Amino acid sequence: MAHYEEVNVRGYDEFCQAVSERKGKDIFAYFSGDKDASGKSWCPDCVTAEPIVRGQMSHLPEGSVFIYCQVGERAYWKDSTNAFKKTLKLSGVPTLLRYGTPQKLVEEECFKADLVRMMFTED
C-alpha cells in the first residue's frame, strides 16, 4: 500500500473539493492538460513530464496527498480568465506545486527528476 494518497480530479471545482476534504494534510498537486480517450494529453510537455514526476512519487512524504488534476481542454486553458490562472496563479502546464506554499515547478522544470525529488523531500 502506498504511503501517500493519490486523487485524480478534473477541473477547478473538483480540485477545490479534493483540497477542502484533506485540510491539514501535506498536499502536492500536479496540473496537466486534459487527456483524450487514448490517455494522451494535448500538452506535449505534460506527456514528457508525467513519467518523470511519477518516477519520484516514492519520495512523497508519509501521509501526504498527491492530486493529479486535468485542467481542461486546450481552449479553456488558453483563456487568461480561467480559474486556475486567476485563483491559483498557474502560468503553464505542467505545474507541480506544494499546496499552500510558494514551492512550484513549471513546464520544463518538471522534466528534472532532481527538482521533483527535492520538492517531495524538503520541508
From Swiss-Prot:
CDD domains: TRP14_like. One of its GO terms (molecular function) is protein-disulfide reductase [NAD(P)H] activity. Residues 41-123 form the Thioredoxin domain. Its main location: cytoplasm. Disulfide bonds join 43-46. The record marks 44-45 as: Contributes to redox potential value. Induction: Up-regulated in liver in response to Singapore grouper iridovirus (SGIV) infection. 2.8-fold induction after 8 hours post injection of SGIV and the expression increases up to about 70-fold at 72 hours post injection, then decreases to about 26-fold at 120 hours. It is found in: Cytoplasm. Keywords: Cytoplasm, Disulfide bond, Redox-active center. Predominantly expressed in liver, brain and muscle. Also expressed in kidney, intestine, skin, stomach, gill and head kidney. Disulfide reductase. May participate in various redox reactions through the reversible oxidation of its active center dithiol to a disulfide and catalyze dithiol-disulfide exchange reactions. Has peroxidase activity and may contribute to the elimination of cellular hydrogen peroxide. May function as an antioxidant involved in response to viral infection. This is Thioredoxin domain-containing protein 17.
